[in-house]
């Protein structure tokens, strides 16, 4: 272990020596840049672009380009990047993560690689965690870029598509991680190229990269549409039922936060809902509602997992930042179950139209880099998932903060008394204090205790984060007491007020340890910026969530040896700190394993999504006749239909093929079994294909000109692809839930998901081609409707296509439930196009 640690340290030192060598080369240009006039310095941007076009690489331009930005920042902002900031900028340009402590000037560091990469003209995205930081950084640092002749855009959620397109077309675009993800999804749902807003994804520089790529890695971005609200009563009934249960009726697994009915709970459910067997297959939907109601009532906690807004909306609380996640909803019906629990209006369930995780969103960029003050603990994940190294950058000045040993109390009450007493003592002498909590509930509790003690303070949590930047900026003033939920206010520096250094600087008090060491380090890092004095002190109790779930047995044994009897007794020990860190490492390992599994599942969706989106983009951007593609779909559809009956009795096979042709290819009376008898399969395929081509030509002849034909082809394909893809996403979600249960049968659920997901994807492609074929062959095309179709294209519901086949199944040939479906899929009619008829 010692040898491994020594090797890691040596590698870091070697990397720093390389960075320092390049940084010195950047610094060697300083005098030359000082001597340039403003006009000459600004002219360097055009010079760099020309040199890049002639074949110089960005790496060759780096020393001089970085030097230009340093000098520009000095003239425009009065700020001159230090050597360590140059080193951080080099790491960012290389597509890695410089670990730079709080207050070391990460925002200024980013200007150098952002400028250099913008020279290539392919766009640079600077990603922040909220719109306040995007706007602030774009406004402040944008002055430097604009002065140097580069365009800067800000992409905000409230902007129109035209404004977003303008922002993305700038050399440098500031955006939040969620908005850039949603724009990507929306771009892959439009029907016209002019409605797209993004350019190809080139270089993303992510601020607070650990928050986005680690903490939110499992968070999917979902674009969805509403479905029927008839299920609301089921949510309410399930909620009423679980509220009748006692603790013996359900079983909770504390470490995994899962819950299920016990035998007595099952008996009560069968009695309550008048069932003979709760787990009969026809009750699958009901068990889903009950499971969600159990989770909502006994796992999800008010003011910890979610809050209820003043207007009665359930808002998710981000467990890592303490902020509410506006616009986000728990998936799979859990949000509706919580709404039923809290007695607020139940919003309609939604159907997913498109989704992507941050892991796969940001891996699509040609180059990805990020900044943070705390990433070394997650180095393995950054390397394995994102192919990014973590390079610790030295501080410009030595760290003067004093990190005190943790204090452990037997109970929550004794711990909070000690916290209040510490705050009171420090506040009396005027030392500013930042009290960090992991939950809204805890911050409210401490606030009440400070009010009782007569200590004025500010509270910063998920309920009032709109003021967070202002509150955090004042947290370093003399006498300030600030309670902050977790890392609320992250991204805003706490600067010390007058006379505070003499009082010991900012004191950070942690009210419990977080599951992640990184989050604790972030809290500590709010104090002692740029060599300022400061202190940090963590208060723990045996009743803390981390201790209760992961560390209590060992630590209790340790405390038994210490003879911890009285409630206010406090333990201060280095061994305790090691035990706590060991518990945190176990949790971090569990969380990493979970994120890895999410990625394995999502990679299946990613591969399929990339195929669909690439083909979709080809259709949208095509300025040509899509006839060859549609004809190929028609041919494959015919081939599949004929092949599906290759092993059937010949008479039955011919009858089935004729049924397929009549319903999907040609006018009903224009084909009979008689003309196909005696032909081989290949001959049948060719005969049907030639008939289909003739009808295809007839259909297109009804359109006015080539422009109308291309538009019709595009809308036809996109409408069907989008409908099938939406259904496929839901089917994959259901498959994922189903294969999760197979782990109990010793099957690898990920392998099963990959295999079945691939087969489902192939089936979807076949279904798309079948629907394109049938609609192309059977549509009634009205030229006079073309203009209206163009206007409504974005809804993917063109008015120039009306299927000749009525939705009424009486218009279909009579097919029995268990016969082969006439579409040629090979499935039984009841499991294919007859499903709606029989449901």
UniProtKB/Swiss-Prot annotation:
Q: Which PROSITE patterns match?
A: SECA, SECA_MOTOR_DEAD
Q: Does the keyword Transmembrane helix apply?
A: no
- Write down the chemical reaction(s) this protein catalyses: ATP + H2O + cellular proteinSide 1 = ADP + phosphate + cellular proteinSide 2
Q: InterPro entries from the entry?
A: Helicase_ATP-bd, Helicase_C-like, P-loop_NTPase, SEC_C_motif, SecA, SecA_CS, SecA_DEAD, SecA_motor_DEAD
Locations of Basic and acidic residues compositional bias?
A: 780-790
Assigned EC number: 7.4.2.8
Where is this protein primarily located? membrane
Query: Mind telling me which GO cellular component terms the entry cites?
Result: cell envelope Sec protein transport complex; cytosol; plasma membrane
Q: Which residues form a coiled coil?
A: none
Enzyme class (EC, first level) = translocase
| Residue stretches of biased makeup (Basic residues) | 827-839
In this chain, composition skew of type Polar residues spans 791-809
Report any one BP term from Gene Ontology.
intracellular protein transmembrane transport
Which of this chain's residues are annotated to bind ATP?
85, 103-107, 493
Keyword Zinc on entry: yes
Q: Which domain of life is it from?
A: Bacteria
A molecular function annotated in GO for this UniProt entry is:
ATP binding
The residues listed in the UniProt record as binding Zn(2+), with positions renumbered to this chain, are 821, 823, 832-833
Q: Give the note describing cofactor binding and stoichiometry.
A: May bind 1 zinc ion per subunit.
Q: What's the stated role of this polypeptide?
A: Part of the Sec protein translocase complex. Interacts with the SecYEG preprotein conducting channel. Has a central role in coupling the hydrolysis of ATP to the transfer of proteins into and across the cell membrane, serving as an ATP-driven molecular motor driving the stepwise translocation of polypeptide chains across the membrane.
Report the family membership.
Answer: Belongs to the SecA family.
Q: How does it assemble?
A: Monomer and homodimer. Part of the essential Sec protein translocation apparatus which comprises SecA, SecYEG and auxiliary proteins SecDF. Other proteins may also be involved.
**Protein name per the record:** Protein translocase subunit SecA
Q: Which gene encodes it?
A: secA
């Amino acid at each position: 272990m010692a040898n491994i640690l020594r090797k890691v340290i040596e590698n870091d030192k070697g990397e720093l020596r390389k960075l320092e060598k390049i940084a010195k080369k950047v610094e060697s240009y300083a005098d030359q840049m000082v001597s340039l006039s403003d006009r000459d310095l600004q002219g360097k941007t055009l010079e760099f672009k020309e040199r890049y076009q002639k074949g110089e690489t960005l790496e060759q331009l780096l020393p001089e380009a970085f030097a230009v930005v340093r000098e520009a920042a000095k003239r425009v902002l009065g700020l001159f990047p230090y050597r360590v900031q140059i080193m951080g900028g080099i790491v960012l340009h290389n597509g890695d993560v410089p670990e730079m402590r709080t207050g070391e000037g990460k925002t200024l560091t980013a200007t150098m690689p952002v400028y250099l990469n913008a020279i290539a003209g392919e766009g640079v995205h600077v990603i922040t965690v909220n719109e306040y930081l995007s706007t602030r950084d774009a406004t402040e640092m944008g002055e430097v870029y604009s002065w140097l002749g580069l365009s800067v855009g800000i992409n905000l959620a409230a902007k129109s598509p035209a404004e977003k397109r303008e922002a993305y077309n700038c050399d440098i675009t500031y955006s939040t991680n969620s908005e850039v993800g949603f724009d990507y999804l929306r771009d892959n749902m439009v029907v016209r190229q002019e409605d797209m807003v993004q350019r190809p994804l080139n270089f993303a520089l992510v601020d607070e990269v650990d928050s986005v790529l680690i903490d939110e890695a499992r968070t999917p971005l979902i674009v969805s549409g509403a479905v029927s609200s008839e299920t609301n009563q089921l949510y309410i009934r399930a909620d009423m039922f679980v509220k009748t249960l006692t603790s013996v009726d359900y079983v909770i697994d504390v470490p995994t936060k899962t819950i299920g009915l016990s035998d007595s709970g099952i008996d009560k459910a069968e009695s309550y809902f008048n069932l003979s067997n709760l787990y009969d297959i026809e009750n699958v939907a009901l068990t889903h509602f009950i499971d969600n109601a159990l989770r909502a009532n006994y796992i999800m906690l008010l003011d910890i997992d979610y809050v209820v807004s003043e207007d009665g909306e359930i808002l998710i609380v981000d467990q890592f930042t303490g902020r509410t996640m506006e616009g986000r909803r728990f998936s799979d019906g859990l949000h509706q179950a919580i709404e039923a629990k809290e007695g607020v209006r139940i919003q309609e369930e939604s159907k997913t139209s498109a989704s992507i995780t941050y892991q796969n969103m940001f891996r699509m960029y040609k180059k990805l880099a990020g900044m943070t003050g705390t990433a070394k603990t997650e180095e393995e994940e950054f390397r394995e998932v994102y192919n990014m190294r973590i390079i610790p950058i030295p501080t410009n000045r030595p760290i003067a903060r004093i990190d005190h040993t943790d204090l452990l109390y037997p109970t929550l009450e004794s711990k909070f008394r000690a916290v209040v007493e510490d705050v009171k003592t420090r506040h009396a002498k005027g030392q500013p204090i930042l009290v960090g909590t992991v939950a809204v509930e805890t911050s409210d509790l401490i606030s009440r205790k400070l009010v009782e003690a007569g200590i004025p303070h500010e509270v910063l949590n998920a309920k009032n984060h709109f003021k967070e930047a202002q509150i955090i900026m004042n947290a370093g003033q003399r006498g300030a007491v600030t309670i902050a939920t977790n890392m609320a206010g992250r991204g805003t520096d706490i600067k010390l007020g007058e006379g505070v250094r003499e009082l010991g600087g900012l004191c950070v008090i942690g009210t419990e340890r977080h599951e992640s060491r990184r989050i604790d380090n972030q809290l500590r890092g709010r104090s002692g910026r740029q060599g300022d004095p400061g202190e940090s002190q963590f208060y723990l109790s045996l009743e803390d969530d981390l201790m209760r779930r992961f560390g209590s047995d060992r630590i209790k044994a340790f405390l038994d040896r210490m003879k911890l009897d009285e409630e206010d007794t406090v333990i201060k020990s280095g061994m305790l700190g090691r035990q706590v860190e060991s518990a945190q490492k176990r949790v971090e390992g569990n969380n990493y394993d979970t994120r890895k599994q999410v990625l394995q599942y999502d990679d299946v969706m990613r591969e399929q999504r990339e195929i669909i989106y690439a083909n979709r983009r080809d259709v949208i951007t095509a300025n040509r006749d899509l006839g060859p593609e549609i004809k190929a779909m028609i041919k494959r559809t015919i081939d599949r239909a004929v092949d599906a009956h290759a092993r059937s009795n010949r008479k039955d096979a011919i009858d089935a093929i004729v049924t397929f042709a009549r319903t999907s290819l040609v006018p009903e009376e224009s084909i009979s079994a008689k003309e196909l008898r005696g032909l081989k399969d290949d001959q049948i395929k060719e005969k049907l294909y030639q008939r289909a081509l003739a009808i295809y030509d007839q259909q297109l002849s009804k359109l006015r000109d080539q422009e109308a034909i291309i538009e019709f082809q595009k809308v036809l394909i996109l409408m069907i692809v989008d409908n099938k893809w939406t259904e496929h996403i839901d089917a994959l979600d259901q498959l994922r839930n189903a294969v999760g249960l197979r782990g109990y049968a010793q099957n690898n659920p990920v392998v099963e998901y990959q295999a079945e997901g691939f087969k489902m994807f192939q089936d979807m492609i076949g279904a798309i081609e079948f629907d394109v074929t049938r609609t192309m062959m059977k549509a009634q095309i009205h030229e006079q409707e073309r203009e209206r179709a163009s206007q409504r294209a974005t809804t993917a519901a063109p008015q120039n296509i009306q299927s000749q086949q009525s939705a009424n199944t009486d218009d279909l040939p009579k097919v029995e439930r268990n016969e082969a479906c006439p579409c040629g899929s090979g499935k039984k009619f009841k499991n294919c196009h007859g499903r709606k008829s029989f449901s």
